[in-house]
Amino acid sequence: MKHIILKSAALAFLTLGTMSCADDLNISPIDPQTSSSYDVKQLLAKQYASLGLTGQKGPDGNGDMSGDEGESGFYRTVFNLNELNTDEILWAWQDNEDMAPITNMAWTSASPRVNWCYQRLAYDVTLHNQFISEQTGKLPDDEIAEIRFLRALNYFEFLDLFRRAPFKLEFNGELPDEKVGIDLYNWIDQELTAIEPMMKEVGAYCNSKDFGR
């Protein structure tokens, strides 16, 4: 019995000694590439990049959404639903997946291209909500207003294409509400009216490193 007690005490001592070797309040990242800070300007750039790019590696790669990354961009998805069913476009390859319903204005939620558009708009709204929630009070009002404009643009496309939107203005774990028709229109109108005085003058960035915003 004495030997068992001694062995147990020794094991407990070694365990406590091992645990105390690390000062939990002063641990540095093991990976030297790891950083707890980030460049806010790069985060701002991502908000604008979401209009044209589809992922994290420039023109393609590590896509924002699963599926055919090339079909998932903001401009392309909005263009598909707005223009492919008009006289401005003649799409000769009607055997392409779900192309016939789109060109004949008979598309439904079963269409991959419709889903990509809906998901792209929802993803971008979430991206903008995160930026606005985390940076309001830290960045100038005009920069926050820019992203509020981009968010309103996505909600406008929701209204134009689907007449409704999963509506949310905060970045948290709560599910969005739904705004439909005139309610969504009124919010967009009020939001744009509210941010207009905060926006930079037209051409304010033309001679700066921020050209293109």
Feature map (PLM): residue ranges:
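Bacterial Sec-dependent N-terminal signal peptides
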Residues: M1-P29
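Membrane-proximal, proline-rich intrinsically disordered regions
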Residues: C21-Y75
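Short linear capping/connector segments at secondary-structure termini
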Residues: D31, F167-L175
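Non-transmembrane alpha-helical segments in soluble domains
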Residues: L44-Y48, D189, E196
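Conserved, well-structured interaction surfaces
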Residues: T54, L90-F162, L175-N186, L192-S208
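Outer-membrane beta-barrel and related beta-rich outer-membrane complex signature
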Residues: P59, F162-P166
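Core domains of carbohydrate- and sulfate-ester-processing enzymes
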Residues: R76-A92
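An alpha-helical repeat/solenoid feature that recognizes helix-turn-helix modules
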Residues: G212-R213
